[in-house]
Amino acid sequence: MLAGAIHMMRGTPYIFQGEELGMTNAGYTDISQYRDVESTNYYQIMLERGKTKEEALHILNERSRDNGRTPMQWNGGENAGFTSGRPWISLPDNYKTINVEAEMADEDSILYYYRRLIAIRKEEPAVAEGSIEFIETSDPQILAYRRILGEDEILAIHNFGSEEKAVPPACKEGAYSLLLGNYKSDAEGVPDKLKAYESVILKKQAY
């Protein structure tokens, strides 16, 4: 959902290594697995301030810079196909299922979703060059906007909430066809509701 929201906005989207696979934080269970000096120092500080080892590790799992330094997960083999040697830092345990090889074989994967987002930016001039018009909504968890270039228009609606939300009436003005969504759907136009963290990208139909 976040990728859909960012890639349909103005500007140049940035993809950090592994984001396009849904790579996760490291999930280390022992401080010896960390390499970042600030993380290991902060771990000791937290212990001195009364945190348990489990509490300190939980905090590092959310905040440590090492979460963004784990090797690229190419496949489910040894060291995720990154190296035949010993990597500088260990991999998350989920690399056997979250990796390039597995996601290239699955058209419903996060990797395929990112590829389609990039393709839409190339195929639709309104996304790459158009203006942006935000749509007012009564729900702060709904982000909706139009990208407009001449007669071309792209509508993007995103639910940042953990519950199903109604699509604002202002998004239903005009006829649209669905370009991309992060849920499987038979709907062809603007839906009445968005599921939790659902994102839909639609193109205005020409008359």
Regions found by a protein language model. Give the residues of each.
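Ordered hydrophobic segments in well-structured contexts
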Residues: 142-144, 154-158, 177, 198-203
